[in-house]
């Protein structure tokens, strides 16, 4: 069993507010995105620099190849999985910070999560599942909750989450139940409203209105409140685009996909301008409108220079926090992760913002 060290950070408004957790309904998996930092390094950061920088962020556990640092008590809130009121996992609503434990996996110097770290995380999470009576389908990614690209390897390959759940079930002596990557069943009425062909009413009409706004047209009948073939076709198109089961049935996983599509459609109304050239940490710091443009685009893609700080760290200065946000973005999209903004990073950002 992984060694768990209770090493709580001091109570403060930024990463350990001392608020009581409403319930433990799930476990949200993260990665630290700080190559080479150990679990203890992370704990010390959140007990010092994070507070000094007035950054709202934390998690309950940090796991590396050797141990797990328990830095926030389980019964308290940690700021790990809430982003501008987004929560796409129904059983964690309305705010995953108040309904879930956060587990961060440390990253090796080469940007990977070591097998021993994953093993330790599985042992920790299995113990937490046993303690709080959770099934493996209550283990989700940060990505599932807010659409943030975390943990990056598990976002690139959702099969890694499935493998992790199976590992946890094996440790608990259970058989794994097949579940979706987002840990929500399209046909489970307990997870939310289910809409399908043949149904009608206000819920259907609202869904149709949202589909049209998100770019999935209903040219013949529009939002008429009847779930017919045209609505099925629009839902299937949405599901295919999101990479989920395309059955034409609206349920929790389709709701998540629709919410993401709505956010994307809203972002398209904005014209994005990003600078040419190279931007990096220099002395004195590079600054000005061009840097603000880079920071604003990063924030729109959920890679905040300093989430929770004033304007989420958008200050017009290309410092270490902006470089770190760029590096996290680069890691997610397979670019050279050096924290330097250049032509390839610009092109990828613009492709995602369009």
Curated annotation (Swiss-Prot):
**Molecular-function annotations in GO:** N-acetylmuramoyl-L-alanine amidase activity
Q: Which GO terms describe its biological process?
A: cell wall organization; peptidoglycan catabolic process; peptidoglycan turnover
Residues of the signal peptide = 1-39
State whether keyword Nucleotide-binding applies: no
Cite the entry's keywords alphabetically.
Answer: Cell wall biogenesis/degradation, Hydrolase, Secreted, Signal
Q: Where in the cell is it found?
A: Secreted
| Gene Ontology cellular component terms for the protein in this record | extracellular region
Task: Specify the N-acetylmuramoyl-L-alanine amidase domain's residue ranges.
Answer: 40-152
Root EC class: hydrolase
Q: Which Pfam families match?
A: Amidase_2 (PF01510), PG_binding_1 (PF01471)
| Protein EC | 3.5.1.28
> Gene3D superfamilies annotated for this entry?
Peptidoglycan recognition protein-like, PGBD-like superfamily/PGBD
Q: Which reaction does it catalyse?
A: Hydrolyzes the link between N-acetylmuramoyl residues and L-amino acid residues in certain cell-wall glycopeptides
Where the protein is mainly located, per its record?
A: secreted
Q: Which residues cross the membrane?
A: none
The record ties this protein, via CDD domains, to: PGRP (cd06583)
Family the entry assigns: Belongs to the N-acetylmuramoyl-L-alanine amidase 2 family.
Protein name stated in the entry: Probable N-acetylmuramoyl-L-alanine amidase
The taxonomic lineage of its organism, from the top, reads:
Bacteria, Bacillati, Bacillota, Bacilli, Bacillales
């Amino acid at each position: 069993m992984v060694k768990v060290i209770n090493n709580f950070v001091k109570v403060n408004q930024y990463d350990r507010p001392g608020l009581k957790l409403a319930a433990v309904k799930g476990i949200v998996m993260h990665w630290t995105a700080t190559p080479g930092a150990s679990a203890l390094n992370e704990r010390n950061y959140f007990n010092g620099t994070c507070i000094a920088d007035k950054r709202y962020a934390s998690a309950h556990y940090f796991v590396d190849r050797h141990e797990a640092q328990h830095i926030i008590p389980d019964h308290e809130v940690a700021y790990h999985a809430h982003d501008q009121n987004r929560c796409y996992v129904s059983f964690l609503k309305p705010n995953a910070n108040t309904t879930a434990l956060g587990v961060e996996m440390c990253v090796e110097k080469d940007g990977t999560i070591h097998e021993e770290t994953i093993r330790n995380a599985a042992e920790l999470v299995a113990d937490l599942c046993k303690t709080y009576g959770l099934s493996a389908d209550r283990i989700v990614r940060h990505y599932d909750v807010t659409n943030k690209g975390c943990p990056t390897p598990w976002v690139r390959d959702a099969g890694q989450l499935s493998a992790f759940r199976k590992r946890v079930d094996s440790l608990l002596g259970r058989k794994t139940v097949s579940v979706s990557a987002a840990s929500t069943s399209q046909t489970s009425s307990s997870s939310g409203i289910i809409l399908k062909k043949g149904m009608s009413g206000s819920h259907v009409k609202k869904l149709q209105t949202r589909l049209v706004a998100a770019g999935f047209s209903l040219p013949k009948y529009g939002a008429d409140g009847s779930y017919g073939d045209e609505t099925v076709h629009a839902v299937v198109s949405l599901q295919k685009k999101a990479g989920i089961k395309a059955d034409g049935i609206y349920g929790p996983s389709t709701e998540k996909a629709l919410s993401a599509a709505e956010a994307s459609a809203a972002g398209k109304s904005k014209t994005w301008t990003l600078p040419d050239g190279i931007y990096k940490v220099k002395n004195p710091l590079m600054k000005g409108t061009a840097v603000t443009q880079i920071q604003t685009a990063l924030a729109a893609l959920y890679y905040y220079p300093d989430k929770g700080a004033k304007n989420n760290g958008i200050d017009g200065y290309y410092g270490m926090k902006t470089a770190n946000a760029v590096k996290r973005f680069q890691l997610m999209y397979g670019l050279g992760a050096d924290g330097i903004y250049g032509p390839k990073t610009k092109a990828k950002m613009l492709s995602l913002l369009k």
